[in-house]
């Protein structure tokens, strides 16, 4: 199976191939599978960008999308994730896109199901397609990753985006810095160095902001939104510290006036909405890879038709 579970399981050449494929889709080259293919999106956590961009990518590729709503499914009757995926496999689904609150939920599935699994986010663990779209956005801007300084600011401990990006950016030759409240530092993330926020922003080629993951916190945040913004947010004053040519990224949803001043969301250095656009092309590339690796009765479906 051509699963996409974490980027750490892909070689750098595989990652670059996905980015190249995404650029091909961005440039307007249409594709569709040689035979009908079916995909289901299983989102057990709320999502706007990831879910909608996967659905857009699936339709652009001519895939048949099977509706699935956990709140109206047998999950409410106690059905396990494994049995849900096996059910979809049994009725003919070829790939599943899954977002789940449990870290590494896919370990119970990867060797036990006959469909391609695409991880759309697992708890605090990984978010591979978000990292890919971030990489594509950075590459479009700078042409390379080697030697860049990427600063990730905010709720590092609870962020799957921070974990995924720090690992892959380090492998690609970037220098990763972290900044944020000390109580939200992630001792398990060894792919970056913690620095004070003003220093981080002044050194950055890429300023990547993270929202506060309230839903993953055992205790309520000790700061008000206004206090957080002043101490750890990208304020209008801090933005003046950015180098010429530095860019702002955010995986969204954006909490304006908390992690970033509202005026900066669509300011000249911001690539936040470009990230969202790139998400469709990246997910098209990921879905294409998943379907190409799909085993059907011992036959790997690899042939895709180019639509002239």
From Swiss-Prot:
Gene3D superfamilies with a match to the protein in the record: Aspartate/ornithine carbamoyltransferase
Quaternary structure (record): Heterododecamer (2C3:3R2) of six catalytic PyrB chains organized as two trimers (C3), and six regulatory PyrI chains organized as three dimers (R2).
Gene this chain is encoded by: pyrB
GO terms (BP aspect): 'de novo' pyrimidine nucleobase biosynthetic process; 'de novo' UMP biosynthetic process; amino acid metabolic process
Gene Ontology cellular-component annotations: cytosol
Keywords assigned: Pyrimidine biosynthesis, Transferase
Lineage of source species: Bacteria, Bacillati, Bacillota, Bacilli, Bacillales
Protein family per UniProt: Belongs to the aspartate/ornithine carbamoyltransferase superfamily. ATCase family.
Known EC number: 2.1.3.2
Function: Catalyzes the condensation of carbamoyl phosphate and aspartate to form carbamoyl aspartate and inorganic phosphate, the committed step in the de novo pyrimidine nucleotide biosynthesis pathway.
Metabolic or biological pathway, per its Swiss-Prot or TrEMBL entry: Pyrimidine metabolism; UMP biosynthesis via de novo pathway; (S)-dihydroorotate from bicarbonate: step 2/3
Protein name, per record: Aspartate carbamoyltransferase catalytic subunit
Organism of origin: Geobacillus thermodenitrificans (strain NG80-2)
InterPro entries: Asp/Orn_carbamoyltranf_P-bd, Asp/Orn_carbamoylTrfase, Asp/Orn_carbamoylTrfase_sf, Asp_carbamoyltransf, Asp_carbamoyltransf_Asp/Orn-bd
Residues annotated for carbamoyl phosphate binding in this entry: 49-50, 99, 127, 130, 252-253
Catalytic activity from the UniProt record: carbamoyl phosphate + L-aspartate = N-carbamoyl-L-aspartate + phosphate + H(+)
Origin: domain of life: Bacteria
GO MF terms, alphabetically ordered: amino acid binding; aspartate carbamoyltransferase activity
Ligand binding (L-aspartate): 77, 160, 211
């Amino acid at each position: 199976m051509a699963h996409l579970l974490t980027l750490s399981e892909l070689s750098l050449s595989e990652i670059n191939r996905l980015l190249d494929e995404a650029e091909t889709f961005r440039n307007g080259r249409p594709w569709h599978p040689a035979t009908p293919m079916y995909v289901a999106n299983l989102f057990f956590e709320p999502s706007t960008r990831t879910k909608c961009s996967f659905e857009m990518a699936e339709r652009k590729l001519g895939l048949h999308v099977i509706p699935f709503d956990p709140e109206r499914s047998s999950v409410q009757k106690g059905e396990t994730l494994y049995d849900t995926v096996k059910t979809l496999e049994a009725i003919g689904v070829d790939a599943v896109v899954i977002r789940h609150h449990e870290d590494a939920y896919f370990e119970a599935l990867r060797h036990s199901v006959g469909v391609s699994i695409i991880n759309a986010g697992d708890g605090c663990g990984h978010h591979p397609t978000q990292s890919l779209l971030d990489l594509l956005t950075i590459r479009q801007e700078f042409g390379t990753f080697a030697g860049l300084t990427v600063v990730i600011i905010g709720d590092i401990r609870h962020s799957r985006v921070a974990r995924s990006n720090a690992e892959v950016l380090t492998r690609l030759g970037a220098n990763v810095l972290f900044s944020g409240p000390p109580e939200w530092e992630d001792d398990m993330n060894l792919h970056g160095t913690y620095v004070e926020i003003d220093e981080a922003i002044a050194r950055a080629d890429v300023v990547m902001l993270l929202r506060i993951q309230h839903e993953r916190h055992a205790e309520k945040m000790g700061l008000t939104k206004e206090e957080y913004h002043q101490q750890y947010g990208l304020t209008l004053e801090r933005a003046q510290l950015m180098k010429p040519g530095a860019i702002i990224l955010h995986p969204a949803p954006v909490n304006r006036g908390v992690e970033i001043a509202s005026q900066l969301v669509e300011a000249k250095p911001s690539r936040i909405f470009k990230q969202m656009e790139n998400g469709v092309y990246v997910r098209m590339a990921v879905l294409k890879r998943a379907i190409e690796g799909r085993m059907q009765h011992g036959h790997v479906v690899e042939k895709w038709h180019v639509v002239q």
